């Protein structure tokens, strides 16, 4: 699941699918994908912004992005 989340996030952030708001859209999609799979991204607004910029500027490999997403995600409690 985390590999799919990373692929979605990286692709949306780097490939400029939209005229504007690619970084915000990529982050929102990552958060929604994680929530759909009962996980929550635990990053401050500044941390998530810095992380997304680092991805877009190709400062992180796929494996590094994956590791950061895993380390900053927590499973939601089951009902």
Set out the residue ranges of the language-model regions.
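Helix-hairpin-helix/helix-loop-helix acidic hairpins
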Residues: 1-11, 15-17
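N-terminal alpha-helical segment
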Residues: 5, 26, 30, 44-48
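Amphipathic alpha-helical segments in well-ordered regions
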Residues: 8, 12, 32-33, 55, ...
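Active-site beta-strand/loop microenvironment that shapes enzyme catalytic pockets
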Residues: 12-40
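Short, conserved aromatic-histidine micro-motifs
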Residues: 42-57
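A structural-propensity feature for long, helix-poor, extended segments
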Residues: 54-68
């Amino acid at each position: 699941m985390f590999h799919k989340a990373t692929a979605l996030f990286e692709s949306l952030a780097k490939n400029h699918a939209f005229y504007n708001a690619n970084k915000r859209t990529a982050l929102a999609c990552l958060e929604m994908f994680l929530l759909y799979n009962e996980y929550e991204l635990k990053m401050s607004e500044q941390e998530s912004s810095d992380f997304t910029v680092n991805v877009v500027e190709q400062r992180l490999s796929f494996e590094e992005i994956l590791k950061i997403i895993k380390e900053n995600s927590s499973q939601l409690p089951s009902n």
